[in-house]
Amino acid sequence: LFNIEMVRAIMEGRKTVTRRAVKLPYHPGDILWVRETWNGDWCDHYIYKADGGSAKAAGYAAEPKWRPSIHMPREAARLFLRVTDVRVERLQDINLIAVWDRTIKPADLHLYGWDANPWIQVIEFERISKDEALGGEGGRGRTTEGAG
């Protein structure tokens, strides 16, 4: 972490701080695909549990075995996001505008160290079309596996 010169500076009291670059997983311009609980068949017909509709209404004889979002292939994705901003902030710095959009429920704040006020990464995004995400005409655009 420190070279010899820096170790000496620490020992002599001349160095009391260090800075390191934060390595964030996403950057503005990255395209994410959203994985979700899903089911698909051999003819590329996909249904999504988030729709809340009946599987029978989608043509299934019975309720399908839902597949976990972690196993969703990109070709089954229907939601694509372009990252517009990435930053770090303190948990308690969530502003009133962002309160409605936070992932952490007020009842669960104790689980995430609210009182400790940890640093969190904030990823802002905009929804884009599948065609735009894949580079038009069904081409393969630059996409990054997104959270499920």
Indicate residue ranges for each PLM-predicted region.
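Secondary-structure transition motif
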Residues: L1-G148
